[in-house]
Amino acid sequence: MIFLGILWSFNSAVSQKPPYPNAQFITTAAWLHSHLNDSSIVVMDVRSGDHFDGSLIPGAVHVPWSDFRYNDLDDNLASTFVGIRNAQKILGNAGITRSDTIIIYDSVGRDGGATASYVFWVLDVLGHQNKKILARGIDAWKENGYDRVTAARKPEPLLYQAGLDQIKRNSLIDGNFVYRQLGDPFYQIVDVRSQEEYLGKVGTKGLEGVPLKLGHIPTAVNINYTEAWTDPESKGIKPYAGLQKRYRGIDPSKGIIVYCNSGRRSSFSYYILRLMGFENVFTYEASWKEWGNPDRFFPVETTPNKLINNTLPGVSTKVSAQQSSAGKDSSQNRSSQPDSGYISCGG
């Protein structure tokens, strides 16, 4: 009965009506099983460390998601994106080309897809058109009783090269960009961490073990990335109607900046928003490991912000943030924030 419930959870999330606006970004184990021998399909196992159990979907290449990150010692940033050139090299070494349809999977144990989503984000930045995440990853494959193998496919390296006009360089935003948008009515900021992290009740440390600042980016609202799950056990993605309800108040006509601590969790929220049809979505990949670094003079607050009148608070002079007494602003007050003004994505 438990198995049937889990099976229904992820199958219904993919085949439900109305479908996700960008339903091409998600697939089921059953669909993959029936298309496994398609010449255009490349299956990509992105699990790493203890989350990789040594068994793979037949024909899969193994490219740990962590290969796309490195520790930037110059900027004192842990686990940051390796960059466009290196990302293309990693994909090429795995025998992947621009014309391939890439099926990305990890495992339920890895936050229900929050590493597959990081690779999805990388592919989105590179402008790779044909990509899908396997709903519930290797777990869904196992639950269907499909065959597995113990050796990854090791193809000959190929040239993976995106055209300059295809790469979304403007998607690679940093703290300075986010800071300049704090008063811009076009941008909405969403903190996808836990409520405890958002309110500054729980802190983390930077690359050198120095405690990061507590709180969140001013004007940001908190929508935990886990709220896209149907439940914490199966970690299946909610049907479209459920996602619409949770993200009510987020304006799809505006830019949305999502962040977490290191860019991994926010990549999942990025994926969910893309699945829902949002186009102007940006992952602040350096996230709190940059913004919360005490060496950087970015303002923080611990007072929660709420969505009001279906509009994100704090993004215009007409709509201000509704703040409760549950928290307080940091010592860096609002006067340190920039004046309102539109800055293009190229800033």
Label every PLM stretch briefly.
Residues M1-S9:
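Bacterial N-terminal signal peptides
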Residues N11-S15:
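Sec/Tat signal peptide C-region and signal peptidase I cleavage site
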